[in-house]
Amino acid sequence: EMCIRDSWDNDKTGLITNDFNSPVINFKNLNTLTDYMAQEALKSPNGHVRHIILTEQGFTATSQSRGNVPQIQAAAYAYSYYMVDSNPYIDAYILSRQVDAPSEVRSGLSFGLWECSMDRGDDIVATKRRKIWQVFRDIDKKKYTLESSEFAKPIIGIEKWSDVVPNFRWKALEK
């Protein structure tokens, strides 16, 4: 199983590179995708870079090898949000689930901002907010953005967001 952490720590795999031949595009090398789309041959007829919408994105809060990992889920979201927010060619970033789906949870996937009731069949009934919910609520607010994502830096292994996020929007607020 690929660990959620691999999203920002997969230089070791050799699958994530910052060139157009990268076998995998993920949040760590997201700029490679938008740089690719900025090539002349791929621009719109009026010469503009085509913008991208990321849909059905998500990070699971459960891991078969590590159990319940809501802090890692929230850290992965914070990292991915900052990568998207700082890229002018990403128009939207849509998460897969607001609330876990019981059928997915039974398969080991817990993408929601909320946990779900597991005693209601496949009905999706929210029961408890996860850490990601608070990050989702506050990460785009100037007053709270860095505070809401501070917990994620040691998980990811960084001192500053601007060290890993190109054109980090909130760099002036960092200490």
Q: What are these language model-derived features?
A:
Residues 2-4:
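Short, small-residue-biased leader/transition segments that mark boundaries at the very start
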Residues 6-7, 57-58, 62, 98:
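Cell-envelope and extracellular/periplasmic
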Residues 8-23:
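A solvent-exposed, charged loop/short amphipathic helix patch at secondary-structure junctions
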Residues 21-92:
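Catalytic-core region of carbohydrate-active enzymes that cleave or remodel glycosidic bonds
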Residues 62-175:
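Aromatic-rich peripheral "rim/lid" segments of glycoside hydrolase catalytic domains that contact
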